[in-house]
């Protein structure tokens, strides 16, 4: 029995999953199910990737905390996976104490080996947003191939990697402004020092895809560079120890460690020895990472380097899949082809898409096209017309005429032998992730089964006197061929196969026993296992996707010229009654039991006031201490549930964010604002 640990790329918890995501998860799930059917101990883990600037900014725009945002999308992702029959043994998150402990431990080990250094670098800084910009928040023209609208770290056209400062005509994704260059001290991982480790891993990896090997050779030729593993505050993630929460681990450092955390969490729950699967290099277990082709760089350079230098087993291999196109073109919201997983599930069963993807997937990193017309035809022809049809043509005769019991003899041993002889070829195809080849072999057998039934015509034999035994044997062989096919298809369409197993009255058949026919075996009454896809269902998926786009755009498309909702006019004397003062925030803290409030202690130049301000969604207490702001100093004190509020801090807001007012330098606590 093999010990196999499989991980899948962690989905980023700031949006819903689409069918392009599902391609990779379905691929790995099929392979894992196949391994388990063979009797191997195969553990499948995943989790949510939850850190980074995109999550921080989206949460802020929604007026919620990053934790609330990632919880929302993690739950939605897991439900989509469950409904698509992606059967993870454990689903975790990168935002928890276990992952933090692992990240800091690995960082300390790297640091102790002098593989971490610090140096000041020029970074893109958005003066309007007042923050350093992550690589993906800078866009511009690729410095290598001159493709426009490329991210600040890599080009999606030519695959080049570079520094954001190298972009031509860069702009901030946040404000649209041209970023300025500003120095900041960052932490770097010495990747070049571990080049030999990486090359040794590549040489020992007999399963590495040729496309990956070629890309690695290209990167080595360009020369490895030290890797910036830090990001400046503000940032949602784990602070680097000893930086007073001013520097944070780059999301791509802590995200892969989420694999370790998810598996360790599984081990803790199930009393499994972590080292048996993910110990050091001497471990005989197998470790596989399934990923999309856009993240090969991180998983085949940085990840093996980090693992090999910190005492962890390196991957047995990394398997990458291509992107998904729909009807021959890039997924598009305007065409209704940017289909979310949930939109598909609201209209169709997952088995059809799982089967279609399997029929197109190979071990190569090829893009897969979801041709919707072919999708309907193939699902109806193969699943319904070929496989399920075998059982529906034979089951009634067995159930009604022969006490639901299969024959004790095999009618056509030669045909049975042909089904048996294909077992090894189908097994090898699944093992090598050549699912398209496996499907072709399985469907070729389904064709032979249907030809056998067509030739003997049990529906006609049943009308002829003295042909009862032949009807029994022909239909029994048909049911047995169906049984072989559904075992082979179990990794691909598990829910349909589960229904078929109930009909066949079998609880579990191992992969090795798949070709064996059932003799004198009692079956149950046949019920339809799958129905044909109507074209209208697919059309509705496209319509629902377009409507989703319209709903997203409607607030913008109907946007009128901004109108200021000016309050009722007041006199100068009325205004002068309001005493506005410069105040320094000397203390700031959370208010227990309050969702929106922070407690502020304000210094007005010798006079101290306590204020409860509804700014919790926008600011951390520690970020406010020492700031100057403006307050209404003569507002009548107001007794609140949490204490006395002795004024009001001024802030601006548009429903998307809250921004406290800060005076220019030189303004001192106690000065009056006029």
From Swiss-Prot:
Q: What is its main location?
A: cytoplasm
Q: Which residues are noted in the entry as Zn(2+)-binding?
A: 142, 145, 155, 158
The residue numbers the entry assigns to motif 'HIGH' region are 11-21
Give the coiled coil ranges.
Answer: none
Main EC class of this protein?
ligase
Query: Has UniProt tagged this entry with the keyword Zinc?
Result: yes
Residues forming the tRNA-binding domain are 574-674
Q: How is the cofactor bound?
A: Binds 1 zinc ion per subunit.
Please give one Pfam family short name: tRNA_bind
**Gene Ontology terms: cellular component:** cytosol
Q: Tell me the InterPro entries matching this sequence.
A: aa-tRNA-synth_I_CS, Anticodon_Met, Met-tRNA-synth_bsu_C, Met-tRNA_ligase_1, Met-tRNA_synth, Methionyl/Leucyl_tRNA_Synth, MetRS_core, MetRS_Zn
Kindly give the CDD domains that the UniProt entry links to this protein. Anticodon_Ia_Met (cd07957), MetRS_core (cd00814), tRNA_bind_EcMetRS_like (cd02800)
EC assignment: 6.1.1.10
Q: Which reaction does it catalyse?
A: tRNA(Met) + L-methionine + ATP = L-methionyl-tRNA(Met) + AMP + diphosphate
Which GO BP terms apply?
methionyl-tRNA aminoacylation
Query: What are the binding positions for ATP in this chain?
Result: 333
* Location(s) in or outside the cell: Cytoplasm
Listed A to Z, the keywords are: Aminoacyl-tRNA synthetase, ATP-binding, Cytoplasm, Ligase, Metal-binding, Nucleotide-binding, Protein biosynthesis, RNA-binding, tRNA-binding, Zinc
Q: Where is this motif: 'KMSKS' region?
A: 330-334
Task of the protein: Is required not only for elongation of protein synthesis but also for the initiation of all mRNA translation through initiator tRNA(fMet) aminoacylation.
What family does the entry list?
A: Belongs to the class-I aminoacyl-tRNA synthetase family. MetG type 1 subfamily.
Q: How does it assemble?
A: Homodimer.
- Name of the molecule in the record: Methionine--tRNA ligase
Tell me the organism's taxonomic lineage.
Answer: Bacteria, Pseudomonadati, Pseudomonadota, Gammaproteobacteria, Thiotrichales
What's the name of its gene? Answer: metG
């Amino acid at each position: 029995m093999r010990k196999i640990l499989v991980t899948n790329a962690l989905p980023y918890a700031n949006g819903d999953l689409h069918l392009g995501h599902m391609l990779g998860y379905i691929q790995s799930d099929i392979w894992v199910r196949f391994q388990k059917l063979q009797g191997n101990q195969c553990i499948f883990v995943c989790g949510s990737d939850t850190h980074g600037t995109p999550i921080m900014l989206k949460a802020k725009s929604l007026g919620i905390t990053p934790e609330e945002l990632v919880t929302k999308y993690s739950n939605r992702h897991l439900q989509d996976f469950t409904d698509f029959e992606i059967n993870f043994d454990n689903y975790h998150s990168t935002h928890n104490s276990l992952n933090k402990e692992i990240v800091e431990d690995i960082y300390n080990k790297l640091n102790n080996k002098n593989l971490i250094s610090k140096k000041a670098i020029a970074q893109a800084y958005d003066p309007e947003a007042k923050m350093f910009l992550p690589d993906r928040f800078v866009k511009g023209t690729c410095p290598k191939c001159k493709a426009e609208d490329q991210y600040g770290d890599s080009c999606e056209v030519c695959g080049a990697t570079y520094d954001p400062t190298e972009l031509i005509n860069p702009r901030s994704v946040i404000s649209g402004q041209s970023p300025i260059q500003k120095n900041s001290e960052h932490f770097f991982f010495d990747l070049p020092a571990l080049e030999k480790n990486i090359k040794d891993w590549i040489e020992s990896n007999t399963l590495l895809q040729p496309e990956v090997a070629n890309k690695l050779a290209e990167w080595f030729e360009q020369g490895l560079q030290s890797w910036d593993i830090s990001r400046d505050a503000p940032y949602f993630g784990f602070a680097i120890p000893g930086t007073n929460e001013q520097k944070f681990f780059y999301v791509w450092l802590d995200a892969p460690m989420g694999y370790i955390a998810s598996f360790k969490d599984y081990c803790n729950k199930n009393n499994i020895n972590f080292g048996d699967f993910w110990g050091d290099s001497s471990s005989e277990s197998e470790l596989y990472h399934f990923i999309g082709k856009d993240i090969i760089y991180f998983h085949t350079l940085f990840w093996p380097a980090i693992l090999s230098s910190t005492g962890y087993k390196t991957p047995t291999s990394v398997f990458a899949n291509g992107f998904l196109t729909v009807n021959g073109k890039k997924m598009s919201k305007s065409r209704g082809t940017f289909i979310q997983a949930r939109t598909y599930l609201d209209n169709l069963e997952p088995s059809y898409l799982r089967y279609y993807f399997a029929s197109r997937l190979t071990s190569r990193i090829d893009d897969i096209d979801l041709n919707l017309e072919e999708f309907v035809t193939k699902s109806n022809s193969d699943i319904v017309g070929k496989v399920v049809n075998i059982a529906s043509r034979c089951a009634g005769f067995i159930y009604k005429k022969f006490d639901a019991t299969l024959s004790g003899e095999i009618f056509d041993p030669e045909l049975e032998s042909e089904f048996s002889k294909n077992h090894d070829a189908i097994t090898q195809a699944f093992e090598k992730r050549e699912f398209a080849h496996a499907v072709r072999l399985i469907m070729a057998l389904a064709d032979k089964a249907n030809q056998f039934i067509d030739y003997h015509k049990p529906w006609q034999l049943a009308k002829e006197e003295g042909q009862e035994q032949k009807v029994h044997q022909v239909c029994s062989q048909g049911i047995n061929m169906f049984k072989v096919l559904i075992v082979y298809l179990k990794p691909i369409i598990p829910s349909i196969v589960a229904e078929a197993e109930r009909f066949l009255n079998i609880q579990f058949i191992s992969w090795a026993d798949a070709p064996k026919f059932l003799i004198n075996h009692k079956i149950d009454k046949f019920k339809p296992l799958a129905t044909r896809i109507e074209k209208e269902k697919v059309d509705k998926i496209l319509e629902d996707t377009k409507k989703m786009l319209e709903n997203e755009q409607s607030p913008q498309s109907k946007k009128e010229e901004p109108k200021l909702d000016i309050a009722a006019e007041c006199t100068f004397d009325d205004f002068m009654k309001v005493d506005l003062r410069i105040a320094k925030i000397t203390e700031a803290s959370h208010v227990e039991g309050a969702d929106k409030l922070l407690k502020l202690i304000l210094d007005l130049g010798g006079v101290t006031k306590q204020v409860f301000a509804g700014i919790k969604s926008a600011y951390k207490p520690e970020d406010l201490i020492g700031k100057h702001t403006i307050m209404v100093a003569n507002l009548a004190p107001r007794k609140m549930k949490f204490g006395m509020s002795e004024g009001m801090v001024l802030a601006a807001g548009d429903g998307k964010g809250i921004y406290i007012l800060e005076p220019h330098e030189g303004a001192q606590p106690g000065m009056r604002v006029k």
